[in-house]
């Protein structure tokens, strides 16, 4: 069985999609129909502008949509799909929940809402390497108590064994890092992001998204989607809207999501980039599964050659 996994914010790079745009009219159509800045910032940057959340998100999703459309034209569709944070929206596009126009518009709105949620607040995210979940969670809780003043730090991403990301107010994150180092954390890497994503500080963005969702007719998923917040498929009583509203302000359980997909029989993962960071996480979770990534036309041709006829049609 095949699972598509979609990259999240941070994987963007100047030049992404240019080779696809020049070779495949179907891909070019996606970029041409997107807001004009998508093509401009994807192809020419500058990297600082492409890295602004309100622009990163529609640019990343336009790339993912374009590649997904090419795969679909080849008859390659997944049995399961999931995405890292922003990538969840691309997974839902793959499943037919959103149209191309809807998903690019929606993530542009999401990116702006996430930026606006923390205006005037100094935030930070950091990747903690080679430390167990329980210790990291305990240090975050202790750090919050130590700094007080309503400052927040919590786990944002459970990426893979040995890599967990914490997020929140800068002072609280710095305190958590100090506590983690005292507990023996080998390495803590600050991340170049523009907000305390996947914490309760993103509640204003979640509230705005909830209102925005009222304007959209959510389609019935044609592919099984595994959600960031729950690391499973949708359950009775849950809605996609509710899960997405919570996702922006809750921990992302990527490792658990990948393990769930493997437990359901997925043995081949295709990362739709740009970048190859999620593929590395998958290999750390289970070295026996097959993992391929699509960052370039050369990658795409290799994946099609390997999979043609091997997926659902």
Task: Report residues per predicted region.
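A short, acidic, amphipathic alpha-helical segment used as a generic capping/interface helix at domain edges
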Residues: 249-266
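Alpha/beta catalytic cores of group-transfer enzymes, especially the acyltransferase/condensing modules
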Residues: 11, 36-39, 96-249
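Short, flexible loop segments at boundaries between secondary-structure elements
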Residues: 230, 290-311
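Glycine-rich phosphate/pyrophosphate-binding beta-alpha loops
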Residues: 56-58, 196, 251
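FabD-like malonyl-/acyl-CoA
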Residues: 1-136, 268-300
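Non-catalytic positions within long, well-ordered alpha-helices that form the structural scaffold/packing
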Residues: 72, 181, 262-263
